[in-house]
């Protein structure tokens, strides 16, 4: 079994793959203050709840956009799993041709999504990942990573409205019964949801026009399904695209290491 860990700014998503299939997955809050022991005990409980143990895991890969947390996670893997994790970053073999001005600036999550998107859905592609920040990545027909767009995530937008407007409440992000709100909460829900849908459709439209292509549009991330249901530009929702990409990267690098005799 292979353990994959995708650490975002708000949440971390964990998964276990067996023979290429995602058999378990969990989501937990990203906590920069937890120690390797706290993470170890938390993951131990998650595994045991599914009848698994540290000893069942034969390999680990980690992707993180939160550098301060990596030391604790790497120590945790070595202490409890007795495995040195593969970390998405410099030195890992992705197979991607990245056309960014500085390829090192491309976030680990965006690289992982691109790897999975190309392998699962071909190219050209636009991948929209609804996280703390929403990222749009464009992969052309030659499977080159061309760049993309980064915007504040929908939760950041909602929190900004709540925190900067004294009389507006904190709300749940959900579909309202009507675009025309009949109270403050439903009016805010309509504004945040449909405003964000409009942003997605506008950015995707402009990316397609500039690329002069009709790429497949893949959505992933926590709110992908909600946005996709209200949008006419998203072709496929794959909530586990990042976890699948992590597994693919693990397999690719494990094969290369085996061929080198490492």
Curated annotation (Swiss-Prot):
Binding site for K(+): 129
EC category name: transferase
Active-site residue numbers: 109 (proton acceptor)
Binding site for ATP: 6-13, 132
Comment on bound cofactor: A monovalent cation. Ammonium or potassium.
Protein name: Type III pantothenate kinase
Short name of one Pfam family: Pan_kinase
UniProt KW keywords: ATP-binding, Coenzyme A biosynthesis, Cytoplasm, Kinase, Metal-binding, Nucleotide-binding, Potassium, Transferase
GO biological process, one term: coenzyme A biosynthetic process
Subunit composition and interactions: Homodimer.
Its biological purpose: Catalyzes the phosphorylation of pantothenate (Pan), the first step in CoA biosynthesis.
Catalytic activity: (R)-pantothenate + ATP = (R)-4'-phosphopantothenate + ADP + H(+)
Keyword Ribosomal protein: no
Subcellular location: Cytoplasm
């Amino acid at each position: 079994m292979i353990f994959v860990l995708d650490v975002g700014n708000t949440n971390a998503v964990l998964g276990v793959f067996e023979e290429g299939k995602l058999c378990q997955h969990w989501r937990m809050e990203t906590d920069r203050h937890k120690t390797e022991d706290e993470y170890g005990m938390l993951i131990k409980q998650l595994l045991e709840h599914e009848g698994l143990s540290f000893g069942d895991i034969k390999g680990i890969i980690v992707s993180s956009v939160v550098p301060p947390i990596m030391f604790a996670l790497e120590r945790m893997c070595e202490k409890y799993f007795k495995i040195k994790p593969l970390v998405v970053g410099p030195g890992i073999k992705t197979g991607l041709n990245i056309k960014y001005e500085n390829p090192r600036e491309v976030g680990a999550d965006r690289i992982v999504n691109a790897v999975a998107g190309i392998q699962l859905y071909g190219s050209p592609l636009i991948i929209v990942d609804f996280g703390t920040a929403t990222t749009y990545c464009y992969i052309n027909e030659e499977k080159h990573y061309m760049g993309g767009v980064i915007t504040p995530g929908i939760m950041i937008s909602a929190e900004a409205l709540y925190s900067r407007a004294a009389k507006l409440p904190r709300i749940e992000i959900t579909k309202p019964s009507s675009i025309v709100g009949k109270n403050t909460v439903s009016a805010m829900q309509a504004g945040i949801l449909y405003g964000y849908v409009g942003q997605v459709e506008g950015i995707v439209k402009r990316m397609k026009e500039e690329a002069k292509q009709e790429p497949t549009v893949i959505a992933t991330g926590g709110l992908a399904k909600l946005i996709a249901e209200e949008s006419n530009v998203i072709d496929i929702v794959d909530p586990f695209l990042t976890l699948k990409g992590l597994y693919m990267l693990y397999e690719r690098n494990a094969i290369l290491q085996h061929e080198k005799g490492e």
